[in-house]
């Protein structure tokens, strides 16, 4: 069997880009077979190997497994890296601990591939589990044989092969695999045996479904590659079906953002119907859309400097945002010059709810001004407001300057010189 797997591995070039590979070894039959396979064919694959093992401390066999793996590494001159799980045990916490440890070892020890012993039975179980949970079609493609991980790749050379084909070599049995406390165990030990009485090719059918799903979504990705997804013009001129695919594909780029079908529909509707929107999604993510584009972004708390107001006295200089303001003192590098009709201090700040500016015949809300001038939400956040005697005297936004209209009785008392520091 190993010869067949070797030929398949070589034909696919799974390890062509790697010299040092880290093997995840639990002590079960799958991972011990993987260890034996990669150790036996190191020369043919042009690799050197290391072993990563987690002692979860949940079973009395854990110490024996660790000791066996340590001794195996010493006998075969293979480095072994051990980590110990601590805290309250759960499947999710244990999995996170494992993969964080694998990533750490790879980065610190120079391994460029993590290799795990997932096989075809695992693939069938994963697809079935996702069907039970109501996952979207794209996720029925299941486990990928090669995927990006840490500073390299995660490779699963056994994935096309059923567990029953692996040699029955020495290994440790995990008694928890018989427990019905875990969904995957119930699928393996209860649901599959019952359903296979109706269709004895059930696992093969699920694997075929995963392969066809993968093929379908690869084709859709290829066919839509030229579309700039976050460009509103490009996105909105597609059919609704293509829009759904594009948005699903875009959201999938954020692994820690899991949106429900209802949340997805809300996001899609906002993109289709709103010109400007900032919408909080979940898990620290929000949707930002303006007239030209939309983006999903991780929310970062606003800094104090964003909220601060600065007081500018006559004959003084202040820096606020990207601008240098000189009140009454000429500067040759000024990009903007504003006439000032009072010598009282000028407050430099960001916009506030209810801000208005006098434009001559009428007073206009800043919010309405931004809408009329098609100022994007990002540009609105960066707008600089100049206030004097509790009255707005200027707004700088999107490279434009809007000034309060002076009355016919106003007398100019000085000038405000403004330099855009980003132009230096």
Swiss-Prot record:
Places the protein is found: Cytoplasm
Catalysis: reaction(s): cytidine(34) in tRNA(Ile2) + L-lysine + ATP = lysidine(34) in tRNA(Ile2) + AMP + diphosphate + H(+)
Binding sites annotated in the UniProt record for ATP: 26-31
InterPro entries, A to Z: Lysidine-tRNA-synth_C, Rossmann-like_a/b/a_fold, TilS/TtcA_N, tRNA_Ile_lys_synt, tRNA_Ile_lys_synt_N
Superkingdom in the source lineage: Bacteria
Alphabetical list of SMART domains matching this protein: TilS_C
Keyword terms of this UniProt record: ATP-binding, Cytoplasm, Ligase, Nucleotide-binding, tRNA processing
A single GO BP: tRNA modification
One MF annotation (Gene Ontology) recorded for this entry: ATP binding
GO cellular component assignments: cytoplasm
UniProt record similarity statement: Belongs to the tRNA(Ile)-lysidine synthase family.
Function: Ligates lysine onto the cytidine present at position 34 of the AUA codon-specific tRNA(Ile) that contains the anticodon CAU, in an ATP-dependent manner. Cytidine is converted to lysidine, thus changing the amino acid specificity of the tRNA from methionine to isoleucine.
NCBIfam families named among the record's database cross-references: lysidine_TilS_C, lysidine_TilS_N
PANTHER family listed in its UniProt record: TRNA(ILE)-LYSIDINE SYNTHASE-RELATED (PTHR43033:SF1)
Protein name: tRNA(Ile)-lysidine synthase
Gene label: tilS
